[in-house]
Amino acid sequence: MKNKYLKGTNANILLLGIVSFLNDLSSEMIMPILPMFIIALGGAGLIIGLIGGLRDSISSILKVFAGYWSDKSGKRKIFVSSGYLTSALFKLFLAFSKIWQHILIFASLERIGKGLRTAPRDAIIADCMPKERGKGFGIHRAMDTLGAVIGSIIVFLLFWFFGFSFKSIIFMAAILALLSLIPLYFVKEEKRKPQDINLKIGLKNLPRPLRLFILVSSVFALANFSYMFFVLRAQEFFTGRLSVGIPIFLYTLFNIFYAMFAIPFGKLSDKIGRKKVIIFGYLLFSLTSLGFAFFNSLTSFMVLFAFYGIVYAMIDGNQRAYVSDLSSEELRGTALGTFHTAMGLAALPASLIAGFLWQINPSITFIYGATISIISVILFIVFRNYFKE
């Protein structure tokens, strides 16, 4: 397994993978309990949508600027380091929340760190393995998600067997986030010349195929509302300790399947083309959303959360790799930042719409997601002549 997938992998990708492993170990101790923490402090469906949407949008608005600044300055590591540190600090503040408004503030501001680090980090990954970007992003995402798997297992154990409170778990997660900064010190950044560009020129110079792909993926982002609704959907059908334990278990299952398939689908996209893999991912998301709308047994939830993990394995790293394929090296940080920002700007209305529909009928939320996902596939087909394999 090691020889097959990691042979020839750049050291920076492995180091960044370790950083992401530790950071996601921290984050995924928080994420499966976050929607239930919000409910416990008085939040409701629309509040879940607001917090989920703001978290994605705040981080993504910063991504285009961080990507542009990293291109312009010729430096990427400083943004990556600042981002991980910022996230760790606001996770610590989150542990002391007493009302849902505190969660709204701290959970949203924690995403500033993600906004600072993501595009520059992805640009480093893209530059390290130019001929095998799908593999490079797949390896990074797999290590990231392995941390997520272990983190969600830990939170399940802490809650189910040791009776830890939500706040205690979040505090422990914040300490782990601070530890994730250690491997980052050893990442070696290649010297790059500062680019004489401004943000307007950088965006204008993005090629048309890239702009069209960002449009298509933004439509899909309108369907891909916050994971918290999937967790709450599972919680609806259980009571007592099971109403917390089962959603955490299912979220762990999601991460296991994500980790298992991230590298294989990255390598597959290197061979058959990213467009095909991404389209199949969109289609599977649509089917999965319909499943959440109409099935509610534990067995069906296990299958659906597994599919949900496979969807992310198909689209997450491959969308980033495809953006890198469609952009020039000089503007890669700007291109990735623009992509992430578009995703985040779509995330806020997506989650707000999902929250509004949830208050009418939770099933409608998932029917909405399935419908918009199909529209994104149709757009992919309409613009197919602009996209290279």
Residue ranges: model-predicted function:
Residues 36-40, 150-168, 349-365:
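Transmembrane alpha-helix termini and helix-breaking/packing motifs in multi-pass membrane transporters
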Residues 106-146, 322:
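Cytoplasmic helix-loop-helix junction between adjacent transmembrane helices
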Residues 5-39, 108, 209-229, 306:
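Pair of pore-lining "gating" transmembrane helices in MFS-fold secondary transporters
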